[in-house]
A protein has these predicted regions:
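Short, surface-exposed loop/turn motifs at beta-strand boundaries within globular domains
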Residues: 2, 38, 58-60, 71-73
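Short, polar loop/linker segments at the starts of domains and inter-domain junctions
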Residues: 17-21, 52-65
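Small-residue-enriched segments and motifs
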Residues: 4-7, 65, 98, 174
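Terminal beta-strand-rich extracellular "head" domains
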Residues: 46, 51-52, 57, 69-147, ...
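Glycine-rich, low-complexity segments
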Residues: 3-51, 181
Length: 181
């Protein structure tokens, strides 16, 4: 067996390099072949533990994942789906704020996505429960090959309401795709 050492492959003519029938080009790891737009890796997380939030300061919901990009110029597509129940007895508008944070190893939290969900209740005689979904996708450009933690937080805009994320063990999910550039 021979080993060929080259830095670039190019065609003598035309624009196609052909591997003969019955022959296979084998890569030794998942990053051997890279083309723009290709998914390099996928990391997924789910959470079914109910998180109750009744305050106006951000708190972690419990949904998070870690990904270590293979290339510093990769984009990371983060898809978040969090089911929650909004409980309020106030006859006014209440807002639930959700955000996605990125923490690169050795750095500080950076908010990379934000979503506000409104709820209006006309009857204040009793508490009402409203099922809602916080769903968003964020194409992030972290510019690193260090470990990244993505996590979600939520808060209320005012008191007299509660959020129950993953209420009744509903599955909340986060999926991160590293996309080659």
């Amino acid at each position: 067996m021979s080993t060929l050492f080259v830095n670039n492959l190019n065609t003598a003519s035309g624009s196609t390099i052909t591997v003969p029938t019955g022959k296979v080009v084998v890569g030794t790891d998942g990053g051997t072949f890279k083309s723009p737009g290709q998914i390099i890796q996928t990391v997924a997380a789910e959470d079914t533990t109910m998180f109750a939030q009744g305050g106006t300061s951000y708190s972690n919901t419990g949904l998070e994942l870690d990904i270590t990009p293979k290339y510093s110029n990769s984009k990371i597509l983060v898809c978040v789906r969090e089911y929650f129940t909004f409980r309020t007895a106030a006859n006014t508008e209440r807002q639930a704020d959700f955000r996605l944070l990125r923490l690169v190893s050795g750095g500080s939290d950076v908010q990379v996505a934000f979503q506000r969900i409104n709820q209006w209740t006309a009857d204040s005689s009793t508490a009402h429960y409203f099922g809602k979904m916080s769903a968003y996708d964020k194409l992030d450009s972290p510019a690193t090959t260090s470990a990244i933690n993505y996590r979600t937080q939520c808060k209320l805009n005012a008191s007299s309401a509660d959020l129950f994320v993953s209420h009744d063990s509903a599955i909340c999910t986060m999926v991160a795709f590293e996309i080659a550039q």
